[in-house]
Amino acid sequence: MRRKVLITMASLAAAMLVSACGKQENTTANAPAAASDAQASAAPAGKGPMGVAFVYIGNPGDAGWTYAHEQGAKAVEAKYGDKVTVTRVENVPEGADSERVFRDLASKGNKLVFGTSFGYMDSMVKTAADFPDVTFEHATGFKSAPNLGTYDVRTYEGAHLAGVVGGHVTKSNVIGYVASVPIPEVIRNIDAFTIAAREVNPKVKVKVVWINSWFDPGKERQAAESLVGQGADVLMQNVDSAVVMQVAEEKKIHAFGWDSDMSKFGPNAHLASAAIDWSKYYIRTVDEVMQGTWKNTPVWGGIKEDEINLVAINDKAVPEAARKAVAARHDAIRDGKYDPFTGPIKGQDGKEIVPAGKTMNDDEKHQINWFVEGVEGSLPKQ
């Protein structure tokens, strides 16, 4: 799951950028000031360019979560050209206020609307009920409807590959983890990373600092510097900016990028980045809506689907043994021969949680609320 907290906005009344692309057009408009009462549905696919909309919690920038989604939107434009008109709405806060945006996009004839943050869920459920001829897709959610599907990526697989590298590289045996908010997705990532790092080096300790936000460069810097002060010589993150990488570069230690390739923000510090590729899913979904074959089947892609991978591995900083180990683990996960959450797995207290030979199923992974052995830190109360 993803994006459960509200990114602070200057004002809910502030203008939100909307850019429409396709047919060589590029226009902007403001998000609606109030929820639309219109019940119009999008025109059937095939009658002129199909309207496809993306709702972003932030702006794409040049790295991170929204940037990764934007690359998927660009891939749709490149694939379909003047067969689609792609609209983006940026900086849309989570919660009830986002409903205005989804209703506006649906009433203006978009046939397919992607909501790329967890906190849009209830707004999308309500809007989908009133626009049955529009297809809605919600990233990281779990509520569906006949015209509302959900999709996500197994980021924990990318975190696990990073852990393989981290276990090889650390000299202090302390790895710092800058974490966003304590939801199953993030806990899963921390655990998968730690399992891999300690498989390589059982002495590794993974120290976690929470910032309780997806994007807060100031807090991200404070957390990263605090972890360096605690002896971390490798940093991992589950936050959206590249500040953690920049801190690593300044402190002359190493770090991993998250959601996209962050190597340019710390060329010497960068070990690798766990990067998401949404393009295949977005292209496939657009095609299904165009062809009338779309179904609201939940999708959780990963390494097998080439939707998450460890990219831009720094050959100068990552030893050959680590690179070979990552390649082998990648292939094992891809081929279904390995799952990071296969027992025996012990919790922080040393007690067995997953017995030998058992693999946690997806429902169990979605509800994970505990740290594995080797993690130092606690789960904040919600």
Q: What do these predicted ranges mean?
A:
Residues 23-382:
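A residue-level marker of the well-folded mature domains of exported/periplasmic proteins
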Residues 1-9:
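Bacterial N-terminal signal peptides that target proteins for export
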Residues 17-20:
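C-terminal motif of bacterial Sec signal peptides marking the signal peptidase cleavage site
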Residues 12-13:
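Repetitive helical segments and hydrophobic/amphipathic motifs
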